[in-house]
UniProtKB/Swiss-Prot annotation:
Species of origin: Conus pennaceus
Keyword Disulfide bond: yes
Protein name per its UniProtKB record: Conotoxin Pn-B0151
Domain of life: Eukaryota
Entry annotated with the keyword Protein transport: no
Length: 62
């Protein structure tokens, strides 16, 4: 009999939690593929700057 109130409280807590589908997306949510695309673009830009002028070192660090 003492376990019954605990069981009822647990059922109420489980029923009141929102499901994953109920959570709304915010503007800060970004797909992981987009993040990987940005990383690839940044790395390509950096590699292009490094190979722009291998004889003059000062322009490669810009």
């Amino acid at each position: 009999m003492r376990c019954l109130p605990v069981f009822v409280i647990l059922l109420l807590l489980i029923a009141s939690t929102p499901s994953v589908d109920a959570l709304q997306k915010t503007k800060d949510d970004m797909p992981l593929a987009s993040f990987h695309d940005n990383v690839k673009r940044i790395l390509q830009t950096l590699s292009n700057k490094r190979s722009c002028c291998p004889t003059i070192l000062s322009c490669c660090f810009v």
